[in-house]
Amino acid sequence: MNKRLIKLIFIVCSTVIVTGVLYKYINQNYPKFFKESQNIVSFYALLLLLFSIIYSTFSRKEIRRFCFQLAMWAVIFLVIITGYAFRFELHYAYHRVISALIPSYKWSTEVGEIIIARSGDGHFYINACVNNVKIKFMVDTGASDIALTKEDAQKLGFDLNKLKYTRTYLTANGENKAAPIILNSVVIGTEFKNIKGHVGLGNLDISLLGMSLLERFKGFRIDKDLLILNY
């Protein structure tokens, strides 16, 4: 950037600052000044005179170059401001795109909210930390409590031979005997303690996340292909 262009920028910036100060001074000390059309015309005529001096001082090429650079910076500034103003919407849009690419994708928001995308088979899946062990669940609002597969129960340290299968649960495949258990800690976004669950004699393909945990959230809802949990 040559010296003449730097000088041009300095003069334009100075003109803008002086104009702003002058406008504020007049508006504060003479509140009725800008209510009269004649005074407004005079004020803008002064601005026109200032810019005319600038145009007469510099060549058209330098003016065009300055205006182009000024426009570029204005666009950059506008993009930054727009991105900041719509940062939450952009954050949501980003995760929606990822959820379309990755089935059962889960993300958290800043307001204590977990959002889970529906998988291709129509179900919602979520990973939870149960007693410090990672377990994958399928969300089942029809299940009264958490149902663990035999494999997951063993991961958590339960001895299947010592469990008491004293309860009867109704499943899609009929009645099933199960042993009631208590899960000391389940972490999904936040920690929930003493959650009711059971281990059945039947063969589950995947552990089920039932109402004994879902009802501990502040709220949950299904919005189209999203499961939204609030904690």
From Swiss-Prot:
Keywords: Cell membrane, Membrane, Transmembrane, Transmembrane helix. It is a multi-pass membrane protein. CDD domains: retropepsin_like_bacteria. GO terms for cellular component: plasma membrane. It is found in: Cell membrane. The keyword Transcription regulation does not apply. The chain crosses the membrane at residues 6-26, 39-59, 66-86. It holds the Pfam family gag-asp_proteas. GO terms for biological process: proteolysis. This is Uncharacterized protein RP867.
